[in-house]
Amino acid sequence: MIRAYMRFPGGVSKTLTLSYDDGVEQDIRLVEILDKHGIKCTFNINGGVFAPEGTVYEQGKVHRRMTKKQCYELYAESGHEVAVHAYSHPHLECLPASMVAMEIFEDRKCLEETFGRVIRGMAYPYGTYNDTVVEVLKNSGVAYARTTVSTEKFSIPTDWLRLPATCHHNNKRLMELAEKFVGMEVSANPQMFYLWGHTYEFEANDNWNVIEEFCEYIGGKDDIWYATNIEIYDYVQAYNRLEWAADASRVHNPSAMSVWVKAGKHHSKSQIIEIKPGETAKLF
């Protein structure tokens, strides 16, 4: 029997991604931590509620949104992703479809104008949504939308518009899950660790050590691909577009990026193969 499994860039079997919401000042410290350990994050921003330029927050206020200028300076050339979080951070499931569409389009337009790129990712405000919201997203250029559901698992998503996470950073099992992920020997389907939260929570709970220890432990591993949400989404879609011969002896890559496959007639004889853009590769 022929077996073939997706592998991430370089042929690795695991990927890590983070997702943090609201565009708050504490994101600055998180970016410093992530960059130190080579970890990528998606930052979900509400384009309609940037802090006004010159804002001075009262002492003790924890949820401090950044100005548009601050957000640009932090994220624009950082290598991290910027994604939609709805224009005004509403409960989308409470709105009629027309207003949901407006919230998404206005946020996309604002962020695309600010950062000069196409914005296709999203996290649901408050983590709430319904089927109507999902249908609107399908027609609004949104590729994926993160929920607040935590599975404590590492499966690759199948429903990208109802995207769950592995866990929130306050999960008591965070380091246990990290150790399990790092120690995994993956022979079949690839694995993804997805962490989410809000950086102001680190200040509110006085627990920056949680994310510092996590990143120090899980960063810098040769067998983990550190990627943003959209990078993982795009890669999985490219893999799914591979065109296989009837007997799976050849495979054609019609996409614009290289794709890696672990393929073999038996697990013990599997090989990692890079299929370059436009290439038809012979596997056996």
What is the role of each PLM region?
Residues 5, 29-33, 132-136, 210-214:
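A short acidic, amphipathic alpha-helical/loop segment
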Residues 1-8, 112, 144-153, 179, ...:
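C-terminal domain-boundary segment and adjacent tail
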Residues 20-23, 86, 199, 229:
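Active-site metal-binding loops of divalent metal-dependent hydrolases
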Residues 97-102, 172-175, 205-208:
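Non-membrane alpha-helical structural segments and their capping/turn regions in soluble enzymes
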Residues 24, 168-184:
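A Trp-anchored, charged/polar loop motif used as the substrate-binding/catalytic surface
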Residues 35-143, 150-167, 190-199:
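Metal-dependent polysaccharide deacetylase catalytic core of the NodB/CE4 family, i.e.
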Residues 17-18, 81, 224:
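Hydrophobic "anchor" residues on beta-strands that sit immediately upstream
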Residues 1-26:
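Boundary/entry segment of secreted carbohydrate-active catalytic domains
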